[in-house]
């Protein structure tokens, strides 16, 4: 147990962790019993096949956990909406069933209070985004926002200071780090840019917003085997500066 972990702080101020149980091939959740998380309540949320090999968790506008994850058995993007703060049960939805989709998943809550999910479409080699239609995320608007080459691996999503989604991801075709800046709250369109093209770079990226309101991205430089950081110069993350 303990693969593909993702952690957030719940409305009760305690840690909530999603992860993959590789032995049982289940999506599991651990709700910390105290601030130090020296013990936790463990729940197998989804046991229907090989599910949860990649997970991402956030807290919804209703104060309950929302987990996006990959169903490897059916090759679907799935979402679990926790029924209580401890997440001892959840409503499970197969959100995107159009091909081999849902790996490299990342979830956040948009300015509209609804879930926004980035992930890979391995059938069509695209970066896709799902914008939840309700708090439970039982339905969503699905959009392929980058379709040029083999793109969308190991995505990371956040909400920029402009209230729009900002996604970092790996372009495997060109070996580049790319960023997509959503054009609207639903992210039905986006501006995409390769922000580091120096060698084979950009896998395993993570993105957040700094105190200056600009994106900050960490990622792997596989050519030089180094950790790199890109600091966005504006809300669109174009141009940018790099540090290593």
Question: Which ranges hold each PLM region?
Answer:
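Extracellular, repeat-based ectodomains that mediate carbohydrate processing or recognition
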Residues: 1-244
